[in-house]
Amino acid sequence: MLSVFLLFPGLGGYAGITAEKWRAFLLFSGGYVALTALLRLELALTGGGRLPSPAAVWRSMGVSQKLIAGFWALSAVSTALSVDKSVSFWGGPRYEGLLTITLYCAACLLVSRYGRPKRWLLWLFGVSMSLNCLLAFLQLAGYNPLGLYPQGMNYYDANVLYAGEFLGTVGNADIFSAVLCAAIPAFWIAAVKLPGRNRFFLLIPLALCTAVLWKTFVAGGIVGVIGSALLTVPVLLKDRRARAAGFAAVLCVCVLGVAGIYAFGGQLGGFLYEASELLHGRWDDSFGSGRLYIWRKTAELIPERLLFGGGPDTLGLRTDAAFERYDETLGILIRSSVDAAHNEYLNILVNQGLPALLAYLAALLTAAAKWVRTAAENPVSAICGGAVLGYCVQAFFGISSPISAPCLWLALGFLMNSVSHVSKEGVHDK
């Protein structure tokens, strides 16, 4: 998942990359889940230990693990009650049906129980992200080295000759920024927390990832990386007074930042202008590249099916929200339907219901609480928690996808694994 899957560009260019990446996700994640289950069964059959009963498994799980299992169960109920059971199970245009959610949760829980985070995994991720960023730089220079764009087109034809922006072997630029929001915190925290001089090699993928994010300037990604850094630095401090001072400093920075945006954001343009307008109580559906419009239309659907939603990946079946743009080259009006809330938490609420969202948030918050307690002493906890935080901040503006979401679920699994090992065995370096 950290190498072949991440670098696999598909066989048909960006036009079909989501479908092909999803099939690769099923192969790798499904293979991991199946292989782990078979190995555990073999161990039981060869006398290496009996298979535990479901009740015993449940008792052995931590709070975060139980909440993830609950999130899956509530998603399954949502699928059973869905407005379209087939779409809810297999997935719609986003390929995030119950099948995909099952693999997210199963892989996360298995990693949290059996995974052993090794340093070479971080190096492998660093190499993969470096190659991805180098490809992105070539594309940003106007080249099409792998032929991922349609013939004769490049990155700068986005939203003119074709819909959307695409980069690297990830595809959609917003989804690429979600991966960067997990990668950048992981790399800089590792460079700070890991022992040995070799850790400084991680500054290479860190610099490349940061440069790509800055060049593309996806607002959600920028907020995710900055927000993660602000909240992570105090957590890494060992001294209690220093940590308290760090959090106080972060609070001051946030207050001053909001005050600055309120007072001067209107003069700066871009998303800072939009944020300033919102702080002044002026709402426009076009803000956030139309996200406010999508959020408003999505929120209108929530009361209809508050408890279990419409079913995973069914928003596109329930909303009439759409964007229209006139293509001067073709001389036609192009209409693009909305099939995601462009806010992962709102997306869960409308698709899987309020209980599923609460279970998901509770799983993240309980894992975060343990991260805060252990990150200063445990490098694995620090790295994985920072990656989860970066992803979760950008998720307020992002789209969950089987291309980027595995970064969250793997990091969350390793975070729970590292915390559980610390609690049982004491602090140790991995």
Regions found by a protein language model. Give the residues of each.
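N-terminal hydrophobic segments of proteins, predominantly signal-anchor/transmembrane helices
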Residues: M1-Y14, Y32-T102, I261
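Alpha-helical transmembrane segments of multi-pass inner-membrane proteins
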Residues: V4, L27-R40, A69-A80, L98-L110, ...
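Helix-to-loop transition at the C-terminal end of transmembrane segments
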Residues: L11-A15, F137-Y149, Y262-Y273, L307
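Alpha-helical transmembrane segments and their immediate interhelical/interface regions
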Residues: G13-L26, V83-S112, G266-F287
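Membrane-interface catalytic loops of GT-C/OST-like multi-pass glycosylation enzymes that act
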Residues: A15-A19, F89-P93, V170-D174, T216-G224, ...
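Membrane-interface capping segments at transmembrane-helix boundaries
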Residues: L41-T46, S418-V427
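Interfacial juxtamembrane loops and adjacent helix segments
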Residues: N144-L167, F271-S289, L301, P312-V350
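A conserved mid-to-late transmembrane alpha helix and its immediate loop/hinge
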Residues: N172, T210, A299, R305-L307, ...
